[in-house]
Amino acid sequence: MSKITEEVETIITPILDELNFELVEVEYTKEGKDHFLRISIDKEGGVNLNDCTLASEKISEAMDENDPIPDMYYLDVASPGAERPIKKEKDYHNAIDKPVFVSLYAPIEGDKEWLGILKAVDDDTITMEVKEKAKTKQIEIPRNKIAKARHAVMI
């Protein structure tokens, strides 16, 4: 996490807590000449357009007062969507028995990407049920080897 995203989290978390929204992710990126501050929020039952608009207005006001970002940027507040990131401990536990996609820093069994059902989580590893050809098997992945994890849509 960058210094900017950490500072943004510090500014907006109390605002989102007051609105009963969960902060899912803060991302600050440059695309071409433009900078984007993307904030994903959620709540029990999901967020709608009105929720995102309200959060955006409150976040914008707070950022105008304490903005840690020196560049001009576009603020985008949205739902995390079906393929929401899995970052926090509770995200992993909420994803048990659901499809997930995991990208690794280094290959395990020859692959750096795994798609399957998350079966178990502990402090050091996750266990996934994956399909390999016509068979199903379980693999254990050390959590310190996970670059990114997210929910997945399997068809």
UniProtKB/Swiss-Prot annotation:
Q: What is the official name of this protein in its record? A: Ribosome maturation factor RimP
Q: Which GO terms describe its cellular component?
A: cytosol
Its keywords, alphabetically, are: Cytoplasm, Ribosome biogenesis
Could you tell me where this protein is found in the cell?
A: Cytoplasm
Cited InterPro entries = Ribosome_maturation_RimP, RimP_C, RimP_C_sf, RimP_N, RimP_N_sf
List the GO biological process terms.
Answer: ribosomal small subunit assembly; translation
Chief location bin: cytoplasm
Can you tell which superkingdom this protein's organism belongs to? Bacteria
Q: Which organism is it from?
A: Staphylococcus haemolyticus (strain JCSC1435)
